[in-house]
């Protein structure tokens, strides 16, 4: 597993007809490296918006030193909430739990990197 820093993003959806927010969230990553220095969660949002009939928005972003590890741990821990790929169906309490766990794992990743 690579040790790249980056961002864990939480992208949500809003129905354009009803104006209601859905409970679907994409939990994905953007790696920081010199090959895609201009790529961040906002850029990923635009990429995902193409072809999606609902309005996407960034619910939250967590920066971490070990982005792939943090994402893998989140996806494994919350697998029962997964719908398809990186998409999860989360009520507000579940979303808060996943975001909190992402923050905790990101802090632990910083400690690991600082010890190296």
Segments predicted by a language model, with ranges:
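Non-catalytic accessory segments flanking enzymatic or RNA/DNA-binding domains
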Residues: 1-116
